[in-house]
Amino acid sequence: MNSTSNLIEQVIEAWQNMQAKTPLVQCITNSVAANYTANVLLASGASPAMIDNPYEAESFTKISSALSINLGTPTSEQMQAMQISAKTAQLNNVPWVLDPVGYGPILAWRSQMTDELLQFKPSVIRGNASEISTLAGNQVQSKGVDSTLSSDQAYQQAFSLLTHASCIAISGESDYILSNEVDAVIQVNGGSPLQPKITATGCALGALIAAYSAVTTPTIAALSAHIHFAIAGKLAANQAQTMGSFSSIFMDYIHMLDANLIEQYADVKLLNKQA
């Protein structure tokens, strides 16, 4: 059984490995999030590549350290690239993260494409509470791509998704990580209410999980990324209460995170699984 202290030690090791290895992360992401996502990865110590052309997808995925697929603003051409890259990642043991943005009956086309991508066994599925709950087969009132469900409600409904991925990460006021590797639900606290008001923070979080997955297991990757964001959000909120200032300082702390800050501020709890 993992203890919280042991998990935090593994997070510190993952952070150190990412700084040492600078993993190359292929991001097939949405037009709103691409720039912010790339900057978050650079600030974190990874190397982003926004390769979403189906004619280049296979060759680039083969040389990538990890793959992040985000369905925020999908085009037909992007969907082709997603399918090619996901299949290539599975065949070449490249860890990959699926972010099913907006999954649900209102956005039926992308949701069907998401269902098809599950066959390629993502390492981690990451989303907000509504997306994850709906993906798990529950009926949830939709509000575009924003969550109408709390994360503590959603994690109870998401265990079935562990047949598709090693790890499920649900973001919210508290974040929850379900895993085939750890016999508990991992709860991560911290962050700031201003984070979801900044465009693309959730999308960038998915890409950061992918970056960490290049240097550690899927569960520790998800935990590391969520802790990274939670600490940066908490410390930024101590210095700024308005969105513009918070956004800038948040990015600074994404860059300035180190082992001492992780050890000092990581707030992790282990909960019993209740499938």
Curated annotation (Swiss-Prot):
The keyword Metal-binding applies. Keywords: ATP-binding, Kinase, Magnesium, Metal-binding, Nucleotide-binding, Thiamine biosynthesis, Transferase. Its EC number is 2.7.1.50. GO terms for molecular function: ATP binding; hydroxyethylthiazole kinase activity; magnesium ion binding. Pathway: Cofactor biosynthesis; thiamine diphosphate biosynthesis; 4-methyl-5-(2-phosphoethyl)-thiazole from 5-(2-hydroxyethyl)-4-methylthiazole: step 1/1. The keyword Transport does not apply. Its cofactor is Mg(2+). InterPro entries: Hyethyz_kinase, Ribokinase-like. ATP binds at R126, S171. It catalyses: 5-(2-hydroxyethyl)-4-methylthiazole + ATP = 4-methyl-5-(2-phosphooxyethyl)-thiazole + ADP + H(+). It holds the Pfam family HK. One of its GO terms (biological process) is thiamine diphosphate biosynthetic process. It is an enzyme of class 2 (transferase). Substrate binds at M50, A200. It comes from the Bacteria. Catalyzes the phosphorylation of the hydroxyl group of 4-methyl-5-beta-hydroxyethylthiazole (THZ). Belongs to the Thz kinase family. This is Hydroxyethylthiazole kinase. It comes from Acinetobacter baumannii (strain AYE). The gene is thiM.
